């Protein structure tokens, strides 16, 4: 069950583009009344031309979540926005705790009510033929004061997103660049760093490389890979994702489809 769980988290990522329609992860908000989603993407909706909200329906019952973005201003060719998210992971964590199939946390552990808060500043501008976005954020994990350090899930992508509940707070820094290649094809690369000051597992880095084929202003297909590095309780470790799975040929990439209407 571990690797399917990772794949879901991998694909639950943010892929940026150079228009307000494909604006997830940038400082741009969706136009008013616009919807956007994907196979493994949250559903986003434009409240007005400078505000949107996002909810991941796949996790809505087990991991209630909501993200709000506000585009504030333009300054020196940069578009500036703030993004604020709230997460309640306790139902999901308790559902994978215990003995038996689909359980990945030992049954002696129990997770209390945990609330995650994210607050980020996003800055986006055009550079050369592409678009660059920088981001910096504060992560807060509430309710984790009594968590047993042995209850961590020490696997890529999952651990750095849960570490904030064990450490209480953290920082997230990153940047993304997307640019046209030829015709309908464009390329995307990003880098994200998670820092948890005071923790023995304090540093995590993730980068994603994607090829994007845009069918129209309503549909696009993305394929690529993600690379991770982290300081886990068991030691430093790097990983290419997705990994080789018994049901897939070696080297199979991440695949996602986005639609908007």
Regions found by a protein language model. Name each.
Residues 24-29, 33-43, 47-61, 66-68, ...:
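Transmembrane beta-strand segments that form the barrel wall of outer-membrane beta-barrel proteins
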Residues 198-261:
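Predominantly the C-terminal beta-signal and adjacent terminal strand-loop region
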Residues 112-197:
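Detector for outer-membrane/organellar transmembrane beta-barrel domains
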Residues 41-45, 66-70, 117-125, 138-140, ...:
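Residues on the lipid-exposed face of transmembrane beta-strands in outer-membrane beta-barrel proteins
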Residues 15-36, 246-252, 258:
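Outer-membrane beta-barrel biogenesis signature
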Residues 68-69, 93-101, 145-153, 199-206, ...:
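Outer-membrane beta-barrel translocator domains and adjoining extracellular loop/strand segments
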Residues 35-39, 60-64, 78, 111-119, ...:
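Residues that define the transmembrane beta-barrel architecture of outer-membrane proteins
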Residues 48-50, 73-75, 127-130, 178-184, ...:
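Outer-membrane beta-barrel channels and translocator barrels
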């Amino acid at each position: 069950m571990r690797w399917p769980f990772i794949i879901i988290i991998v694909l639950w990522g943010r892929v940026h583009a150079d228009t307000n329609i494909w604006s997830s992860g940038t400082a741009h908000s969706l136009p008013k009344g616009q919807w956007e989603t994907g196979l493994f993407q949250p559903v986003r909706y434009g409240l007005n031309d400078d505000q949107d909200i996002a909810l991941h329906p796949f996790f809505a019952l087990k991991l209630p979540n909501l993200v709000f973005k506000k585009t504030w201003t333009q300054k020196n060719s940069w578009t500036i926005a703030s993004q604020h998210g709230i997460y309640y992971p306790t139902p999901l964590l308790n559902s994978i705790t215990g003995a038996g199939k689909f359980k990945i946390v030992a049954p002696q552990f129990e997770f209390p009510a945990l609330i995650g808060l994210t607050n980020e500043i996003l800055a986006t501008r055009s550079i050369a033929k592409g678009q660059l976005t920088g981001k910096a954020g504060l992560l807060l994990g509430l309710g984790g004061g009594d968590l047993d350090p042995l209850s961590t899930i020490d696997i890529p992508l999952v651990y750095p997103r849960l570490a904030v509940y064990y450490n209480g707070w953290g920082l997230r820094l990153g940047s993304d660049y997307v640019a046209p290649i030829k015709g309908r094809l464009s390329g995307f690369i990003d880098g994200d760093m998670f820092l948890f000051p005071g923790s023995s597992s304090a540093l995590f880095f993730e980068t994603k490389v994607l090829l994007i084929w845009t069918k129209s202003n309503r549909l696009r297909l993305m394929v690529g890979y993600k690379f991770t590095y982290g300081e886990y309780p068991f030691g430093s470790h790097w990983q290419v994702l997705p990994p080789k799975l018994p049901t897939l040929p070696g080297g199979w990439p991440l695949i996602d489809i986005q639609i908007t209407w």
